[in-house]
Amino acid sequence: GRTFVCNSMPLDKFKAVSKGFGVTINDVFVSCVSGTLRRLLQDMHYDADRHALVGGVPFAGVRPEGWQGLGNFATVDYCWLHSEIEDPVERLAASHQSAAAMKEHLKASVEAGADLNALLQVCPPWLISVIRWYINRQRGALGFFGNAALSNVPGPREPIYINRYKLDSWFSTGQVFDGSSVNMTMWSYCGSANLCILADEKVIPDGWLVYDYFVKELDQLVALLPDTQQDPQQAVSAT
């Protein structure tokens, strides 16, 4: 079975941390995901300090000629989720480096036609079935999307209307894949950061615990903003 939860938090908190530490909003998101997973590992009595985890991040792919408008066309790359770093500020800096390295690797892979989507296009169906069988045998030790799938998508800044009806919130989710038990997807919309969590309920029976951990990680970074922004709440409201 699956557990699914979603809720909103102020996007200004992400902007304040981004501005205060000189990183991107996506870096803040990745760092908070890493801190959340660290808390979960500790709850499950694993050694969270042992090593980093691996996150799978989907990206929009370049459609071949004639494929315009035909469903989704995406690829994926991987980044380190530094759950092994206890200090939130150090983890944020490491997440910034991890995200930058992933972007460079993805660009080179796409240019060489060697990204995951391109490779799967040339794999025969029987080989993909064998890969899935092998991944399932590993019981979470290996997965197409690493240890967790995560996605941060910038959404509309202005309200969207369907006829005269205003869209109040924007929630979206990805999938959980073979070998990966949790997906954390965040959309921004009209000043809100909308976080959706989909998980294998055998591994994570309470999705709200994951959401609460994420909020705590974000609030911790806000509280640790540099001294030039003495009042975290003032820094958030001024952004």
How would you name each of these model-derived features?
Residues 24-28, 36-45, 78, 86, ...:
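Soluble, non-transmembrane catalytic domains of enzymes that act on hydrophobic metabolites at membranes
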Residues 28-29, 33, 95, 150, ...:
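Short strand-loop-helix active-site module centered on a catalytic nucleophile
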Residues 178-233:
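Extended, hydrophobic beta-loop-alpha segments that form or line the acyl/peptidyl-thioester binding
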Residues 13, 21-22, 63-65, 80-86, ...:
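A generic structural motif
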Residues 1-60:
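Gly/Ser/Thr-rich phosphate-binding loops and adjoining beta-strand/alpha-helix segments
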Residues 2-6, 67-156:
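Helical lid/core segments from catalytic subdomains that handle acyl or acyl-like groups
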Residues 45-69, 230-238:
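Small-residue-rich loop/turn and linker elements
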